[in-house]
Curated annotation (Swiss-Prot):
Protein name: Adenine phosphoribosyltransferase
CDD domains attached to this UniProt entry: PRTases_typeI
Swiss-Prot/TrEMBL keywords: Cytoplasm, Glycosyltransferase, Purine salvage, Transferase
Keyword Iron among UniProt keywords: no
Organism: Bordetella petrii (strain ATCC BAA-461 / DSM 12804 / CCUG 43448)
Molecular function in Gene Ontology: adenine binding; adenine phosphoribosyltransferase activity; AMP binding
Major localisation: cytoplasm
Recorded GO CC terms: cytoplasm
Family label: Belongs to the purine/pyrimidine phosphoribosyltransferase family.
């Protein structure tokens, strides 16, 4: 069942060559979001995985992690907290910086977004180099959360992010993966 589901989801994701720059193949989830059946299948896959786990919150990484994470939080009857790009939150924040291949960036959360000991599922659409996901994990942990698992629709294992997340001891669940030849 999981293999058929993953293949359905994988077939719905659009690959856009040379975007945002030459040599990059962008994995576009908007066709998946536009198709109500496939979107429901994706959400159900996550719901069935997490419905029996003891979770307090779902955290979603800016921006596509908000889409999946908020729907998943609703379906699991949990709260949702955003992990935002720097400068997007209006209240007191705490930030975690990370390195990109072309510079640095930061993610932020409100200082009161999680309480010590809360069990959090972290969600994003894709894991590539792992910078954003690792920064979000560190940020949640600094705020006192227990990151039960990180989850993404897509893994690009050749870029090393999933291995870096695994090295932190945080479990990672992904639905499908792509290599550079695809």
């Amino acid at each position: 069942m999981q293999t058929d589901t993953a293949e359905l989801i994988r077939r719905t994701i659009r690959s856009v060559p040379d975007w945002p720059r030459p040599g990059v193949v962008f994995r576009d989830i908007t066709p998946l979001l536009q198709d109500p059946r496939t979107f429901r299948v994706l959400i159900d896959l996550f719901v069935y995985r997490y419905m029996r786990q003891r979770l307090d919150l779902v955290a979603g990484v800016d921006a596509r992690g908000f889409i999946i994470g908020s729907v998943l939080a609703y379906e699991l009857n949990l709260g949702f907290v955003p992990v935002r790009k720097q400068g997007k939150l209006p209240y007191r924040t705490v930030a975690e910086s990370y390195t990109l291949e072309y510079g640095n960036s930061s993610v932020e959360m409100h200082t009161d977004s999680v309480r010590t000991g809360q069990r959090v599922l972290l969600v994003d659409d894709l894991i590539a180099t792992g910078g954003t996901m690792l920064a979000a994990i560190k940020l949640l942990q600094r705020l006192g959360a227990n990151v039960v698992e990180a989850a993404a629709i897509i893994d690009l294992p050749e870029l090393g992010g999933s291995g870096k997340v695994a090295a932190t001891g945080t479990p990672l669940f992904t639905v499908c993966s792509y290599d550079s030849a695809e």
